Amino acid sequence: PIYVSFSCLVLAIGAVYYMHSDVSWGMYLGLALLIYGAYMWFRDVVIEAEHQGHHTPVVQIHHRYGMTLFIASEVMFFVAWFWAYFDVSLFPNDFVGNVWPPKDIVTFDPWDIPLINTLVLLLSGTTVTWSHHSLLEGDRKGFIQGLVLTVILGAFFTALQAYEYHHATFAFSDHIYGSVFYMATGFHGFHVIVGTIFLAVCLWRGKLGHFTK
């Protein structure tokens, strides 16, 4: 935990320097340290669970509490971005020309890629739920198939979002609209990428027979 915390500090400081002076090595160093620390930490968790038997019922309860607190923190994180969006969209001020969206912003058609990505997310939620229930029922084939489909859908969502960003007519610095759009959807896309990686690891571990009901 101390090493990972230090890596996060290096990453944050490096990101600030990159924003102000285009010096990027500190940010990439912090990111590399964080990835390495997370890999080693997760590896220890797997070893403790699968080979040493340290995940007693009490430890499992602690894991559930930790996940609950993590999800609560994620909810509050995104509440902040939704709050910023609704505050400026429902009460537009002189800074945005008293209209929303700002008149010089060409927005995406909500019935195009955004709708497709929403359906992809809903479908991925269905497939991962199928995988979970298959595991609980001892159906390892359904468990693996559900995870494979979920990982594919996660990668497809990321590809569509990258395509959407590439064809956007506004930038991060174009009014508060661009800032809120890219921060909210960017962090959401980042969560999808991380979740896809986690599920890919679960798929690999599932093929090794690590999970039981």
Can you describe what each PLM-predicted range is?
Residues 1-213:
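...captures the hydrophobic TM-helix bundle architecture rather than a specific catalytic motif
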